[in-house]
């Protein structure tokens, strides 16, 4: 349960994960009073300039610390000691609240500060964490209680003007940032046809869509992105290339297939709008898209990630997976295979809501990188992109 895990972690981790003689870094003032995030440096996507913060920190990291930056790991329900030990041993660089907390903003801030105290020289080379949550609104709002607004569903948000949504999103973002959450796994940019919305299990049935056409979805998704950015919170456009045309939910079902979406589909325009608005993260779905790549899930498809997302839509930020740790869509693959295949196909940041699965993926990636120079270069490029994103959100030790 998130509440118990968060409070336990806040109360017990003041000395955990530290090497002898080291001191836990004090939480940055930006946790409570952030300024706007900087635009991601162009070096993030073409091999960073030698003088950049990211490359300086990268050069000081061990290979294990670098690989640890590739992970966004769910921590709900995990004992505080296990989380701290995993960060110390496997150097995981980003952590994800999951489940529903009613502890309130003050308690969540305390937990987030305790998490950031784990960013020691030995654990993460003093690179602080993206602390993420799914704070979309409606049925998908993980942080609740005193200090948090009741965020309406995206379908309700879509009825606001874009300007009003941006204003309200900035307020929700300030709440997240005050709680120490600096990455929102939102907005949902999937376009769900109105005629099939109730049969669309992952999005429409939960009213997670802003509307039923690319224009409405794009405009309101961009407003959400801009509002959160004003508050200093990074955002994630999901679930590329869209879950609006499927029936099953990849969290709970395998073999989810989209037979409609192709490289020129109009529904991609909502994601294109988010990319033009400089969204820093795009999450890739765990469905199969027969008109794009009939042989691979999108998160394992170079056609989807390298061809469509990078080359056609010119996305230059961090590509993050949907849950590779516990989703039913990937249950038939070993964790080691999941992580390696995602990175090899063009992904950057691995989401795993399972700590054991994350550990298995981490170790497999380290082994493959040690044995394969080309894969090691792929890993290093992904790490640089993640570090550049962290630099933009003031999480690097260069400030």
Predicted feature locations:
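Second-shell residues forming the walls of enzyme active-site clefts
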Residues: 62, 82, 106-116, 215-370, ...
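Hydrophobic faces of well-ordered beta-strands that scaffold small-molecule active sites
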Residues: 68-75, 93-97, 129-135, 183-187, ...
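Glycine-rich, aromatic-flanked loop segments that form ligand/cofactor-binding clefts
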Residues: 116-149, 168-195, 217-241
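C-terminal region of N-terminal signal peptides and the immediate post-cleavage residues
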Residues: 12-42, 46, 399
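Mid-to-C-terminal alpha-helical segments outside catalytic/metal-binding sites
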Residues: 370-398
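DNA-contacting surface of Y-family translesion DNA polymerases
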Residues: 41-110, 141
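Second-shell loop/turn segments in exported
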Residues: 40-45, 73, 77, 97-103, ...
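Bacterial N-terminal signal peptides
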Residues: 4-14, 134
């Amino acid at each position: 349960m998130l509440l118990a895990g968060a409070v336990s972690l806040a109360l017990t981790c003041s000395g955990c994960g530290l090497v002898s003689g080291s001191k836990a870094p004090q939480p940055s003032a930006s946790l409570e009073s952030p300024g706007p995030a900087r635009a991601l440096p162009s070096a993030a996507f073409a091999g960073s300039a030698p003088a950049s913060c990211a490359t300086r920190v990268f050069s000081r990291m061990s290979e294990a610390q670098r690989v640890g930056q590739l992970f966004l790991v769910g921590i709900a329900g995990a004992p505080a000691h296990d989380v701290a030990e995993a960060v110390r041993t496997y150097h995981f660089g980003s952590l994800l609240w999951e489940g529903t907390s009613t502890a309130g903003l003050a308690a969540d801030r305390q937990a987030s500060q305790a998490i950031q105290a784990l960013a020691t020289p030995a654990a993460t080379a003093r690179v602080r964490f993206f602390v993420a949550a799914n704070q979309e609104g409606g049925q998908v709002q993980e942080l609740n209680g005193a200090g948090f607004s009741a965020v309406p569903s995206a379908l309700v948000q879509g009825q606001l003007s874009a300007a009003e949504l941006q204003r309200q999103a900035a307020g929700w973002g300030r709440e997240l940032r005050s709680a120490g959450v600096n990455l929102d796994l939102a907005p949902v940019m999937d376009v769900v046809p109105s005629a099939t919305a109730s049969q669309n299990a992952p999005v429409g049935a939960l009213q997670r869509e802003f509307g039923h056409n690319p224009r409405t979805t794009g405009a309101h998704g961009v407003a959400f992105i801009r509002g959160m950015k004003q508050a200093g919170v990074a955002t994630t456009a999901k679930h590329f290339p869209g879950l609006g045309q499927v029936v099953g939910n990849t969290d709970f079902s395998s073999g989810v297939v989209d037979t409609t979406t192709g490289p020129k589909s109009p529904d991609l325009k909502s994601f294109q709008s988010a990319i033009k608005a400089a969204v820093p993260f795009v999450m890739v779905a765990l469905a199969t898209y027969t008109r794009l790549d009939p042989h691979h899930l999108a998160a394992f498809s170079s056609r989807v990630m390298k061809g469509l997302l990078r080359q056609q839509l010119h996305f230059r930020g961090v590509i993050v997976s949907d849950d590779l740790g516990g989703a039913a869509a990937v249950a038939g693959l070993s964790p080691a295979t999941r992580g390696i295949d995602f990175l090899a196909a063009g992904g950057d940041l691995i989401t795993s809501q399972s700590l054991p699965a994350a550990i298995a993926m981490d170790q497999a990636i380290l082994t493959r990188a040690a044995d394969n120079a080309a894969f090691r270069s792929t890993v290093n490029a992904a790490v640089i992109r993640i570090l550049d994103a962290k630099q933009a959100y003031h999480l690097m030790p260069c400030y």
